[in-house]
Amino acid sequence: MKETIAYLGMGMWGFSLANLLANNGHRVVGWARNPSLIEQLSTQRQHPAAPHVTIPSNLSFTSSMEEALDGATMIVEGVTSAGMRPVLNQLKSITDLQIPLVITSKGIEQNTGLLLSEIALEIFGKPAAKYLGYLSGPSIASEVLRGCPCSVVISAYDPATLKQIHQAFLTPTFRVYPNSDLKGVALGGALKNVIAIACGISDGFRFGDNAKSGLVTRGLHEIRKFATIMGCRPDTLNGLAGLGDLCTTCFSAFSRNTLFGKMLAEGLTPEQAKTKIGMVVEGVYTALSAHQIATHHKIDMPITTGVYRVLYENLDIQKGIAQLLQRNTKEEYL
């Protein structure tokens, strides 16, 4: 079945998936608030971050959410975590959720500590869980645009919704694996960004691959421990939504979070690094939310805590590294 898809958010990630869905034969209408971006996409048929990509004719664009939703059989969102609530509130003002809503962003809302899926349920109500889906996994936008092989997971509460979303996204090169642990999928995608900042700091100090692999492995342990206490399945974090996404984000030259950490090690302040990158660095905000939740539940997360203290308590990076290296070694548990 071919879908008519409203795609909310036309940043690099949103555009890459909208392009993939259109190339998979679906009619896609991309929505963004920025009128100049929509004008460029519509008239020049180019995305400013990917001018080399040919936009298929069945991918159109609008700055009117009502127009994007007209006739839609599926909604996909690709906005930042900070933009999630206002976009969903706008969506709620137009329609009740009666078709699948696929969340593709990764993060935890500041102040509330809610996952993006939990924001959706708060806005649309618990019955909307039937239509909720979550896509996550190792998926760098530029590689998705090039059609490189990629494996991700799709999670949903309702089996029929899961099947519909799975069929919409699956292509010969975009491998989609079902996973029923939606909360675990969401947490893996959010928390890995914090570990990626730590790995970027390691890169900036040229600590080498051994140190980075140690951070990834111990970081995965932190993510698994956090997710398990939150009621998720530990094996979810061993898969694409956890380990897979963590590896890609920490080792990719295209990762904003890793680049951000590297800039911190090179002497930039967090604000300077964010300005230089020029795009949202989700790990900065997730570090705060994750630290608050971990503190409340008494979860020991030394890497996450270290990143939080560097970003929000002005901890000297060298001192933070020394504190990590001086911790007692105990049973690995992995």
Swiss-Prot record:
The active site is at K192 (proton acceptor). Keywords: Cytoplasm, Lipid biosynthesis, Lipid metabolism, NAD, NADP, Nucleotide-binding, Oxidoreductase, Phospholipid biosynthesis, Phospholipid metabolism. It is an enzyme of class 1 (oxidoreductase). One of its GO terms (biological process) is phospholipid biosynthetic process. PROSITE patterns: NAD_G3PDH. One of its GO terms (cellular component) is cytosol. NADPH binds at W13, R33, K106, A141, R256, V280, E282. It catalyses: sn-glycerol 3-phosphate + NAD(+) = dihydroxyacetone phosphate + NADH + H(+); sn-glycerol 3-phosphate + NADP(+) = dihydroxyacetone phosphate + NADPH + H(+). It holds the Pfam family NAD_Gly3P_dh_C. Catalyzes the reduction of the glycolytic intermediate dihydroxyacetone phosphate (DHAP) to sn-glycerol 3-phosphate (G3P), the key precursor for phospholipid synthesis. PANTHER family: GLYCEROL-3-PHOSPHATE DEHYDROGENASE, GLYCEROL-3-PHOSPHATE DEHYDROGENASE [NAD(+)] 2, CHLOROPLASTIC. Belongs to the NAD-dependent glycerol-3-phosphate dehydrogenase family. This is Glycerol-3-phosphate dehydrogenase [NAD(P)+]. It comes from Chlamydia muridarum (strain MoPn / Nigg).
